[in-house]
Amino acid sequence: MSMQNTANTIEELELLDFTFGGDAFGRLADGKPVFVPFGLPGELVRVQIPQEKPDYCLGRLVEILTPSPKRIQARCPHFTECGGCHYQHLAYEHQLEVKHKIVTDQMRRIGKIIEPAVNPVVPSAAEWNYRNTMQFHLSPSGKPGFKDITGERVVEITECHLPVPGVNEVWPNLDIEAGIGINRVMLRAGTDGDVLAGLEGALDRPPELKLDMPISLHYLGRGQDFLMAGDAYSVMTVNGVDFTVSPRSFFQVNLPQAEAMVKYVLANCGATHESTVLDLYCGVGLFSRFLAPLVTALAGVELSESACNDFALNLDAFDNVSLYVGKVEDIASSIEIHPDLVILDPPRAGLDKRVVAYLAESTAKRLVYVSCDPATLARDCKRLTAGGFSIESIQPFDLFPQTFHVETVVLMSQA
């Protein structure tokens, strides 16, 4: 198997293992690690090395001299050129093994847990066509695509096997004139199948567009958003509950796995009718909506204005719920409740040190930490255990087949 070679420096090496981020890695003769996208451990390869960094090298696969027996044919012709997928060359059961090992390694190396007891990864029911939301970049000619692995250019695509059918029926028909200020298009399919498009641009007002598809259309501008056609929001149904989700609000892209994760949290968080719950980074209320009818009081904290508005709609029926708007690290210590259960679902950057300090000093006896980044999760678990919490369980969920991403739920308690 050969790939385009544009560099002057070529090295032959054996790939040793996977790293978090999807790359395989090997070592040069001097021991310096080389990170190689789309390689597999055990393969003997030739890689180009355009430039050496002080502590590592980034390599590009030129030729596979000895392929791994685990290597399979990728489904998508854009694989290795488009940066959206990382593991299409690996059968799904092996993808799950890699993700389990990555979570375990991060907990051991960064979290300093000697023997992390990581449960088997909960697999996705669908390996393909599972994403209800997609972000398409536009090429200079206005065609949809994704950034390449360098993030420097947009690769125009003719097919994609990650979106749900509703999204896949729309994106190939996107025809946006180049140079009118639109740089990205978000497509989201609600549970009812209705598709909402969010056009992201740098202009204050939307350009003139002709809509010839039965979809809802929003312009997400620099200072203001505009509803141009159709519905103001999508409806996403999780475990029989409908959620209002606006175009700028985050929601889990794999609904069946979101349902599994919610069920797991509810079954293991220890919430009772006497519980007081604090839901930090609560988003549109995915966990709060199911906890609110079970507990005495619940408070959510969220920075996103769009998500806060959706949270208010989704939790409107409950008198025991309050919402605090702002950065968690700025306002957590001033919240006027004394939680015994805290739900954490932060962005990839994880917890600010001030949040960790607040939790260590709080009345919380149980934490549920939902993470999309094993490295920052491991770092935060180390800090939280130093603050008096102990880890009860580590449960990964695969919400993102064909990619290196993995969601992990960690249950923690404090005496």
Describe the role of every protein-language-model region.
Residues 29-30, 53, 138-143, 149-151, ...:
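Short acidic-glycine loop/turn motifs at beta-strand connectors
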Residues 1-78:
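Terminal RNA-binding accessory module
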Residues 119-126, 187-188, 223-225, 396-399:
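Short, solvent-exposed loop/turn elements at beta->coil junctions and helix N-caps
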Residues 187-202:
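Carbohydrate-binding surface patches
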Residues 2-12, 20, 24, 177, ...:
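Rossmann-like S-adenosyl-L-methionine
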Residues 24-29, 145-149, 198, 311:
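Short, acidic/hydrophobic/Gly-rich beta-strand patch recurrent on exposed beta strands
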Residues 62-74, 80-182:
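Extended interfacial segments that mediate partner engagement and assembly in macromolecular machines
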